[in-house]
Regions:
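Penicillin-recognizing serine hydrolase domain
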Residues: 1-15, 83, 113-264
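Active-site-adjacent loops and short helices of periplasmic peptidoglycan-processing enzymes
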Residues: 1-155, 165-168
Length: 264
């Protein structure tokens, strides 16, 4: 058990929570039960459904609609080429590392099958996991049909993050600074940089997922381990003080959390 005193200073996020991953002890929270849009942090649920399906070697063709979908909604893109055939694991990399909305569409379309069926599964899974203040209207967190139609809470997103991080294949991807996929039979070469600036810059950081829209602000689901202690947390609605606003909030929370004394 961690002995909690005070609070992290200078955190600007509208909603936040920091949790000891091993015990579930909440170390600090700000409006952790308030529903807010979480942008691309949504993609963690998309990944979880693919992981639960189990066959990461499944071959999936990138549909023509994936490109137009990402372009139409202004989403981050993994620059997937329609017609390319990639494995589910490679598409998870395209989803989680560069935060590709085209990858989200491709996976949702394959695993629904179809977008509507996949969204129904996302919401059913959230309900089954006890994420009572979470709702999905897209597999990627893009702001449609409205800016706030896909929403969650910091507490619910910790539940989601803990579930996803139980999968070694997920952990391995969200901890990468980049992903290099050489040209192969059926697909072009791809190079994807991780959108999470915590990776490689914060000692002990192991993920998890960034998000940003105008309405959601900067969002980050994060986890770090130091001296055998793992902390997981969320920031939602960090103001746009720069591209790494969510990272700055996360670093302040983690620095504070790791300094707390542990009882016994």
């Amino acid at each position: 058990v961690v002995e909690v005193t005070g609070a992290p200073g200078g955190v600007k996020a509208k909603g936040a929570v920091l949790v000891d991953a091993a015990t579930g002890q909440v170390l600090w929270a700000r409006d952790a039960g308030t529903e807010r849009p979480m942008a691309s942090v949504t993609k963690v649920m998309t990944a979880l459904l693919v992981l639960q399906a189990g066959d990461l070697g499944r071959q999936i063709r990138v549909p023509e609609a994936a490109f137009s979908y990402a372009w139409e909604h202004g989403g981050e893109s993994a620059a997937l080429r329609p017609g390319d055939v990639l494995t589910a694991q490679q598409l998870l990399a395209a989803l989680l590392v560069p935060s590709g909305a085209d990858a989200a569409y491709t996976l949702a379309n394959a695993y629904g099958p179809g977008l509507d069926a996949f969204l129904a599964r996302m919401n059913a899974t959230a309900a089954r996991m006890g994420m009572r203040h979470t709702h999905f209207t897209s597999p990627d967190g893009l702001p449609y049909p409205t800016e706030t139609s896909t929403y969650s809470t910091p507490s619910d997103l910790v539940t989601l993050g803990l579930a996803a991080m139980r999968y070694p294949a997920f952990r391995a991807l969200v901890d990468l600074r980049f992903y290099d996929l050489p040209k192969g039979p059926g697909h072009h070469q791809y190079w994807w940089d991780n959108t999470d600036e915590l990776i490689g810059s914060y000692p002990g950081a192991v993920g998890i997922k960034t998000g940003y829209t105008d309405d959601a602000g900067h969002c980050l689901l994060f986890e770090a381990t130091r001296n055998g202690q793992t902390l997981i947390g969320v920031v939602l609605g960090s103001p746009a003080t720069g591209p790494a606003a969510g990272v700055q909030d996360a670093e302040k929370m983690l620095n504070w959390g790791f300094r707390l004394p542990r009882a016994g």
